[in-house]
């Protein structure tokens, strides 16, 4: 939650800066680009993955071990993809922006019984297909702020077996965000900050590949896990 407040403060400062700049009109770059019904482009960005883990206090009856797990650090990664944008009205557009998210989630484990520690770097390569509704303000000079929200399906291609924890390969998210269109002389640049909230439990509870009880205890110690992500994206149209 602290990180989300920091990201929102950053975007608020950015919006106030734009308002300060909007004191007089200037010559518009690419004045007719928004009249086209279809827009295409690509996007690159950075993201911070998170995994909210719910511990259940399970105690191993054989050893007395009680492991607690948490996503104990920020996990920055890289994103890249393409986009297609369909203008519905002058202020509303439907956008599809399939892409790849390369990242990881660092999980720390602590045994409450003896203080022992373990860790896991849960690597992910998501193939993502987000569908968003983009609602934009009227254009002023060479920028145009907007809000965006929608739904995304992601498939993790690096879901390796044998790890202490595994998450489901297919995950779904709802997302909301904000951004701004900047009209440059030769293209349109859209920096955007978006928050992804995972739907449902993504922890893989049935681990038939684990035959050692010492490996199974990490999954048994968790009730559920929820994915999340904060993505800073730069769209080029």
Could you describe each region identified by the protein language model?
Residues 27, 169, 183-237:
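Predominantly the C-terminal beta-signal and adjacent terminal strand-loop region
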Residues 47-51, 101-105, 152-158, 196-202:
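Structural signature of outer-membrane beta-barrel domains
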